[in-house]
A protein has these predicted regions:
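N-terminal signal-anchor/signal peptide hydrophobic helix marking the start
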Residues: 1-10
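N-terminal helix-rich module
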Residues: 9, 14, 18-139
Length: 139
């Protein structure tokens, strides 16, 4: 009888081990999209600040440390596993060793393209220099 109980418990333990969900080591499409939405929100926050204050507002992008910060606000950190590629024009100011995205009082910007990527997926965030509009599209 004891052997039957031990065998039954072993079978239940084996089934639980096989059926338990395992944490993923890679970033999925939904997580990458969520990070892209957070970054685009910071860009939009910078534009809104420039429009409401009537003065320039810089959004500092630090791809090496994976941090983004609107002037006067707390920085956000991009989660581990997400790489950032940041390209701007030469007209964008250098802040903290990298080019910042500058929004002018009328909403225009110096323009830039941020590409967060993970697990072979990329999402392109394009900030139009003329309108300051932020567009997000899979690459």
């Amino acid at each position: 009888v004891l052997l039957d109980v031990v065998a039954a418990l072993a079978i239940v333990a084996l089934a639980a081990f096989v059926l338990m969900p395992r944490p993923r080591s890679s970033i999925g499409a939904a997580e990458l999209s969520g990070e892209a939405v957070r970054v685009s929100g910071e860009f939009r926050k910078g534009r809104a600040k420039a429009l409401t204050t009537g003065s320039v507002a810089d959004v500092r992008v630090d791809p090496g440390n994976k941090r983004i910060q609107v002037d006067g606000a707390n920085p956000i950190s991009i989660r581990d596993g997400v790489a950032m590629n940041w390209v701007t024009s030469d007209r964008c100011p250098i802040r903290g060793g990298t080019r910042a995205l500058r929004f002018l009082a009328d909403g225009r910007s110096c323009g830039g393209v941020m590409t967060p990527s993970a697990s072979g997926r990329e999402i392109e965030l394009r900030v139009d220099w003329l309108t300051g509009r932020v567009e997000m599209s899979p690459k």
